[in-house]
């Protein structure tokens, strides 16, 4: 995951106040009726809520709205605004705080990897009740499994179990392609697992940064081709290679557009597919000004979307 960023909670709040991103919150919160989202012609650009962990979740929606985001990828993981052990009432309140200022919560991120997770059914039940259409589960590792096919069969059973619960609550499952030892980093294994599963209910959260890290610039296009028929969501990050030693290289996060990802090709493919789901921006690079980092990456995505979707 990413490194800790430099700004303190007090500095973030001061910066938001100076930029007019914090408003008074007098009086009790009143539930707002949820209405179906309006038809879209472009993706829903979101920020991963964990990047705002230093402020209360009640303020997350206002901050994202005033920064110019369309919505929020809401983290429901240990150490987040809404840790799994505090689902009630925080998950519902967190969603209300975001949707109440006119933003969408098109996806939640979880660490759930099994239908037997003690919190998994409750997370999906509340999210389904609140109308959240997508959830991202956690990650499965290959580990030291002596037989890769046996391990993949185990993962398939876990995915089927989770997807069955999610479907009961009208939520689709979006599997994130990570890197390293995570099952599906190269997508071919996950593609095999998903071949017999209804694509309406299980698909991909495609990450071109991890795809480029795994397969290179040219290979990333092939991985996206595998994901596109089942694409549910997108997560964006960028990176460059840096050498920690003469014999090794390390993926170092950087602002969008300053790394190795072929963004022109990526957004052109999204536009051709008429993709209008969530694009989650994750900011894991070091910065002394988080708000400006969010603005930079949001502006980059907006520019790419405008160019690609106008040309498509």
Where are these regions (language model features)?
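Hydrophobic faces of well-ordered beta-strands that scaffold small-molecule active sites
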Residues: 43-49, 72-74, 105-110, 135-137, ...
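Conserved, mostly hydrophobic/aromatic
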Residues: 64, 72, 98, 127, ...
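Catalytic domains of carbohydrate-active enzymes, especially glycoside hydrolases
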Residues: 60-77
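C-terminal segment of N-terminal export signals and the immediately downstream linker at the start
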Residues: 24-55, 59-63
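N-terminal secretory signal peptides and thylakoid transit peptides that target proteins
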Residues: 1-19
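Active-site acidic/histidine proton-transfer and metal-coordination neighborhood
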Residues: 16-17, 58-61, 104, 113-206, ...
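Acidic/histidine-rich catalytic cores of soluble enzymes
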Residues: 166-260, 267
